[in-house]
Curated annotation (Swiss-Prot):
UniProt entry keywords in alphabetical sequence: Membrane, Photosynthesis, Photosystem II, Reaction center, Thylakoid, Transmembrane, Transmembrane helix
Subcellular localization(s) per the UniProt record: Cellular thylakoid membrane
Species annotation: Parasynechococcus marenigrum (strain WH8102)
Gene Ontology BP terms: photosynthesis, light reaction
Name of the protein described by the UniProt record: Photosystem II reaction center protein M
Source superkingdom: Bacteria
């Protein structure tokens, strides 16, 4: 159970962190252009 939970959290962070980074980068480029 514990290992599964840790793996789930790790995979969730592995997906969320780059996604948030790309969104922030995308918003930043849009603001600078406009």
């Amino acid at each position: 159970m514990e290992t599964n939970d840790l793996g789930f959290v790790a995979s969730l962070l592995f997906i969320l962190v780059p996604a948030i980074f790309l969104i922030v980068l995308y918003i930043g480029t849009n603001r600078s252009e406009s």
